[in-house]
Every structure is written in C-alpha cells, then in structure tokens.
From Swiss-Prot:
Reactions the enzyme catalyzes: sulfate + ATP + H(+) = adenosine 5'-phosphosulfate + diphosphate
Organism whose genome encodes this protein: Proteus mirabilis (strain HI4320)
Protein name: Sulfate adenylyltransferase subunit 2
This protein's encoding gene: cysD
MF (Gene Ontology): ATP binding; sulfate adenylyltransferase (ATP) activity
UniProt subunit comment: Heterodimer composed of CysD, the smaller subunit, and CysN.
Superkingdom, taxonomy of origin: Bacteria
Reported function: With CysN forms the ATP sulfurylase (ATPS) that catalyzes the adenylation of sulfate producing adenosine 5'-phosphosulfate (APS) and diphosphate, the first enzymatic step in sulfur assimilation pathway. APS synthesis involves the formation of a high-energy phosphoric-sulfuric acid anhydride bond driven by GTP hydrolysis by CysN coupled to ATP hydrolysis by CysD.
Length: 302
C-alpha cells in the first residue's frame, strides 16, 4: 500500500511511528514524558506499535505535582503494571518540602516549581538527551510554531528564533554534550484526529474524559471539580453535582470541566465536530500571565 492509499489517520500514524524510531536510532538515552492524558495514551499506543513485539526501548517519566486527579494516578499505575513499563515518577523535592500548591501560591508559581523545574531536575538526574512529549500544534499558538525536534540548551530553554529546518521528514538530531531535544510525534495531529484514533484503535483512557455527574464549584467562570478535601472554598462558593467532562487534564485545581452529555467515544467525537472553542480553554495555567505558554516553554516547560 503506497502513501496515496493510506487514510488520513494511517498517514499520521506512520509519520509518528517513523519519528519514534528515528529518535531511538539517533539518541543515546531517550524517555517518554507520560502525563496520563489522552495524547499521552495515543503516543504510548503508537510507541508500542513502533517497537512490537519488543518492549519499549525507553522508560516513561511522570513529573508529578501531587495535585493530579485521583483517577489519573489510578490509571497511571494500572497501565504501568498491565504492560510492564519502566515508569519513573519524579516530584520536585524542594517544592514538596515547601508545600507549594496552586491554592496558596497560585498557578504560575506552582507550575514553574512543580512542573517546569521538576521536569528539568528529572531530565538532569537521569541524563536523558531526548524526551517525547504529546503536544500538538493545534493546541496553542506557541506550540504551532515549534518544530517536531525542539532543541533545548544546557538549561533546557527553548529559543523559538533558533530552530532548525525540517524538510521532507529529515530531522537533524546533532546536539552538543549537555543539550537535549523535546520530540513531538503528534505535532500534526488535531484534537479530532486523537479522538477518532482512540475510537478506531480502542485505546484505554482516563474516565474523566467521559461525562458524568461530578462535584464542582464555579470559580471565575470555570467549573472546578472538587477531587479531595484540600479544596479552598471562597465565600459564596457551593459544591454542586453537575454532569461534566474534561477535554484536557492537569492539576485538578487548575483544570476546568465543561458541561457535557458525551459519555461515549462517538458522543465525544460528535461534540468535537461542532465545538468552536479550544480544548485548552480549561487549562488555567495557559492564561495566568501574558504570553504564558511561550514564556513557560522558554524556561523549560515541555
């Protein structure tokens, strides 16, 4: 079967598998960043296909903040156990000792210390020279201009004005000692592509993506699910039960839910076809500062 006979999703799958294999062939110590979300689940599925029947030739890394949804932790541990993945979990020890959290310290400081600095510490600790991430270009404007091979200096910083050309699926992976790259095999996928692929490949995902009655509060126009007793209720806030789901997942105090009746994959796909808003509108960390995502990426965020 030649390329012209492949379906749209098959072409995307083939491109992603090519990128995964190319990185493993080029780099000495790659790792896959596993955030437990739908994109991570698709990327992990593609990696299993790329190297089947062998085990994955790299570990998974989850940079934990201590504030993920409980269902995410359960799904992470179940997945690692079921497939026998080498899962490394890292949490910024200084941030944990100081009790950094989104309620007291705010989303910007929480993200910088527990996510960005935590990721940089983990990459340095294990000496990884390439890190797969599940980011897509359609998610956010700073990601739209980022290459598939995203080069980082010795401090893990990204310079959007210093990117290498990527012509005809040729990727230049030459780096100096101490430098690294972030690799995005799903760059050319859209949110709809992800959901259609999950449906066609029957990929297991966190149940939070499906609509269900959940305890939520409304804060600054965003529905926040109350996942545990660490919630810091403000005056006038009342916990109510609403049927909601999540289009994107992160730390639960910083992730907005959407009202939805979509409790099956076909219903989610139908919802995506008529949606006019970005999936990351519910990620409060994307709007906590001016040019927030690009600033975070320049500092070392994935």
């Amino acid at each position: 079967m030649n390329e012209t006979q492949l379906t749209h999703l098959q072409q995307l799958e083939a491109e992603s598998i090519y990128i995964l294999r190319e990185v493993v062939a080029e780099f000495e110590n790659p790792v896959m960043l596993y955030s437990i979300g739908k994109d991570s689940s698709v990327m992990l599925h593609l990696a299993r296909k790329a190297f089947y029947p062998a085990k994955l030739p790299f570990p998974l890394l989850h940079v934990d903040t201590g504030w993920k949804f409980r269902e995410m932790y359960e799904f992470r541990d179940k997945t690692a156990k079921e497939y026998g993945f080498d899962l490394k979990v890292y949490r910024n020890p200084q941030g944990a000792q100081l009790g950094i959290n989104p309620f007291i310290h705010g989303s910007a400081k929480h993200t910088d210390i527990m996510k960005t600095e935590g990721l940089k510490q983990a990459l340095d600790k294990y000496g990884f020279d390439a890190a797969f991430g599940g980011a897509r270009r359609d998610e956010e404007k700073s990601r739209a201009k980022e290459r598939i091979y995203s080069f980082r200096d010795r401090s893990h910083r990204w310079d959007p004005k210093n990117q290498r050309p990527e012509l005809w699926q040729n990727y230049n992976g030459q780096i100096n000692k101490g430098e690294s790259i972030r690799v995005f095999p799903l760059s050319n996928w859209t949110e709809l592509d992800i959901w259609q692929y999950i449906y066609l490949e029957n990929i297991d995902i966190v149940p939070l993506y499906f609509a269900k009655h959940r305890p939520v509060i409304e804060r600054d126009g965003t529905l926040i699910m109350v996942d545990d007793d660490r919630i810091d209720l403000k005056a006038g806030e009342v916990i109510t039960q609403q049927k909601v789901r999540f289009r994107t997942l992160g730390c639960w105090p910083l992730t907005g839910a959407i009202p939805s009746q979509a409790d099956t994959l076909p219903a989610i796909i139908e919802e995506m076809l008529i949606s006019t808003s970005s999936e990351r509108q519910g990620r409060l960390i994307d709007s906590d500062q001016s040019a927030s995502m690009e600033l975070k990426k320049r500092q070392g965020y994935f």
